[in-house]
Amino acid sequence: MISFIKGVLIEKDPTALLIDVNGIGYEVFVPMTTFYTLGDIDSQVSLYTHFVVREDAQQLYGFKSKVDKKVFQELIKVNGIGARTAIAILSGMDSKTLLHCIENKDYALLATVPGIGKKTAERLVVEIYDKLLKMANEIYAQTSGTTTTSQDSQAQQAPTSVVLANSIFNESVDALLALGYKQKDAEKMARSAMGDATTVAEVIRKALQGSIKSKR
């Protein structure tokens, strides 16, 4: 069981990282709330991890905090919620927002996550309600995962060429597709979030936040 990983960040794409640990490269899948907190390539990274073994694959999932890891582990215990859907949930909202959804039984907001319909949202609330409430103090104590990184802050001040903008748009669409959104929806979300955004992380963050706000 791999419960924690610390190493050098070699590659980072939305939802997937490559981390060098003493010469061995580990592919780690992460929610966007963790991706937002990462430093630059070649920087040190430490993640709490959950190892999933299936018949056709062995996959490692990483989280910025032990609390997010626990929430993920509770999510995948829910009937109909797999690891990919759990990652999509924690990409669209942090643990605190998820707790609010569960407390308020906000089925409509939960159903905005790709792969979750109304029935699955209702089942999720029923099955995870008590467990998440027991974790409330831990969830509220942790820092929000949507803090802008220094890299994002610097990027916001840099000019964006048409070529770079197109690259950011295409990468953002690919990331949203990886989270389970349909092509048409992913393009619409990325386009509406572009504005003056100059990084993929910034576009995706705005796109996911915009999707949540539109349902409230």
Curated annotation (Swiss-Prot):
- Region described as Flexible linker: spans on this chain: 144-163
What GO terms describe the biological role, i.e. biological process, of this protein? Answer: DNA recombination; DNA repair
For region Domain I, the annotated ranges are: 1-64
GO MF annotation list: ATP binding; four-way junction DNA binding; four-way junction helicase activity
Localization per record = Cytoplasm
HAMAP family given in the database record: DNA_HJ_migration_RuvA
Which family does the UniProt entry place this protein in? Belongs to the RuvA family.
Name assigned to this protein = Holliday junction branch migration complex subunit RuvA
Task: Tell me the organism.
Answer: Francisella tularensis subsp. tularensis (strain SCHU S4 / Schu 4)
